[in-house]
């Protein structure tokens, strides 16, 4: 049985015109896993996420997790018709990081009423929505950030999250049936001394099979012959 990838949003840290930020939906056999949940994603999900079984967050930059906040308000004021809360898988220490925000806003209950909270461990596999996931640490401006290898039905899907060029990224993509990889930069020298993103050439150099570039600014041309993600795009893996 195939796995379907739907690009809900794919903008970089500044939104492309009319586009949501990072959110990628994997579905198979009535199971649904959302990778990242940036601004604009919730409103573009079918049923505003009512069928999403689990969410996994690569890192805590706003363009990858910002719509967790409206998801909480939606659940509080217009709760979807569902039997149980979706699982939310966070990087190590993530539960407390969210709790700090909730206390600051004066709503310490917001996350527990919205999600079943979990933290994943680097390099250790965990299961979410029936998918087997391995979180692999990648370099991103010195913060804690991860890419994911996702397995189901004999297929392996790799997602870079946000990453600089690194051997860890190559290992993440090795042997994958499909690699969704960010390509934010026009060239590597446009990044800072402490790297955090990839150019298209750097993204392609890490690939080991079929690839889809994402997190790509609208201002940059797509490399000739290389597919680039757009909102609403559907890929069968």
Named regions from a protein language model:
Residues 1-48, 145-161, 178:
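Conserved beta-strand hairpin/beta-sheet module of binuclear metal-dependent hydrolase folds
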Residues 6, 89, 116-121, 134-136, ...:
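General small-molecule cofactor/ligand-binding pocket signal
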Residues 34-38, 53-63, 91, 157-161, ...:
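Active-site neighborhood of phospho(di)ester-bond hydrolases with catalytic His/Asp-centered motifs
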Residues 81-86, 94-117:
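Active-site neighborhood of divalent metal-dependent phosphoester bond hydrolases
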């Amino acid at each position: 049985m195939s796995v379907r990838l739907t690009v809900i949003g794919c903008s970089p840290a500044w939104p492309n015109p009319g586009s949501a930020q990072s959110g990628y939906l994997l579905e198979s056999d009535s199971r649904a896993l959302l990778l990242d949940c940036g601004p604009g994603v919730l409103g573009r999900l079918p049923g505003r996420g009512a069928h999403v079984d689990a969410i996994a967050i690569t890192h805590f930059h706003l363009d990858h997790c910002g719509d967790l906040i409206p998801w909480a308000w939606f659940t509080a004021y217009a709760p979807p018709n569902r039997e149980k809360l979706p699982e939310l898988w966070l990087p190590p220490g993530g539960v407390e990081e969210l709790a700090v925000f909730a206390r600051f806003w004066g709503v310490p209950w917001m996350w527990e009423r919205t999600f079943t909270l979990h933290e994943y461990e680097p390099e250790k596999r965990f299961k979410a929505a029936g998918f087997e996931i391995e979180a692999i640490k990648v370099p991103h401006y010195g913060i804690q950030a991860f890419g994911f290898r996702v397995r189901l039905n004999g297929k392996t899907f790799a997602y870079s999250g946000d990453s600089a060029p690194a051997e860890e990224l190559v290992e993440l993509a090795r042997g994958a049936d499909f690699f969704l990889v960010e390509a934010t930069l026009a060239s590597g020298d446009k990044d800072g001394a402490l790297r955090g993103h990839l150019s298209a050439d750097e993204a392609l150099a890490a690939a080991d099979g079929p690839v889809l570039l994402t997190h790509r600014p609208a201002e940059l041309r797509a490399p000739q012959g290389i597919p680039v993600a757009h909102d609403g795009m559907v890929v069968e893996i």
